[in-house]
Amino acid sequence: MNNRLTSALLAASLLFALTLASCGTPAAENSTPPTAPPAQGSQVLEADKPTPAETAGTSEDVPSETPAASGSNILVVWFSRVGITPFADGVDAESSASINIRDGELVGNMQYLAEFVAEETGGDLFQIITEQEYPVAYRDTTDLAKVEQNSNARPALASHVENMDQYDGVFLGFPNWWGTLPQAVMTFLEEYDFSGKTIVPFCSHGGSRLGRGPQDIAALCPGAELLDGLAVSGSAVSGAQSDVQAWLDNLKLD
């Protein structure tokens, strides 16, 4: 009797083991491997008119924090609707106001200038990105900018500098919208203490150069030293490197 019971138990155990083995391959083999998160870029890129290079897309395509500290004491900041506006793939740069193409990508004027300034100064790059996207149509953007200015709005920002204390000098690039800084740039300036820092403005414009920009910067950052800025016509940005170089040389930064 005992022998029969033992044999029955062994047979049942063997059948159970075979059933488990036939239930399929391990989950790891059947599941799709998780997609690696996109690498965070060290920069992102504008203007009064967006110019030669920037990927069409939304603000989700843009890093939201300062690049990893490089040891530089110079930060090159810029604001552009390119990078926070959902331009469609294949947008016609020639027929669209303020849009330019470089190496197959959209780029804002301010990104174009900021990258050159960073290259020449060894500064870190940072783009001011708003939580709200801006309209694709340039006229709609300028209309929105006017509404923001009339209400003295402070658009919420999605990008923030985590290590501002590292920087002694800040180059600040912006498009001249309605005679001065975009309201989002004012949000940026009010977010940090610039006391003891040097601010150097540069802008793209459609005829009014820096406008009230320097005065507004001085009012928002009373403890900062403000150096002479550079104004580049939006239609001349792609050929302005010699002008930018001469301006940088004259600044005689430490």
Could you say what each language-model-derived stretch is?
Residues E225-D254:
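Glycine-rich phosphate/pyrophosphate-binding loop and the adjoining helix
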Residues M1-L10:
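Bacterial N-terminal signal peptides that target proteins for export
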Residues P135-P222:
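Helix-loop-strand module that forms the ligand-binding subsite of alpha/beta enzymes
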Residues L113-E120, D124, G173, F188-Y192, ...:
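Structured segments of extracytoplasmic/periplasmic soluble domains
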Residues L18-S22:
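C-terminal motif of bacterial Sec signal peptides marking the signal peptidase cleavage site
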Residues G24-T25, P37, V44-Y167, D249-D254:
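N-terminal beta1-alpha1-beta2 submodule of the flavodoxin-like/Rossmannoid cofactor-binding fold
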Residues V107, Q111, E115, P182, ...:
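Short, surface-exposed alpha-helical segments at coil->helix boundaries
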Residues A97-V107, L172-P175, P201-G207, S233-S235:
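Second-shell loop/turn segments in exported
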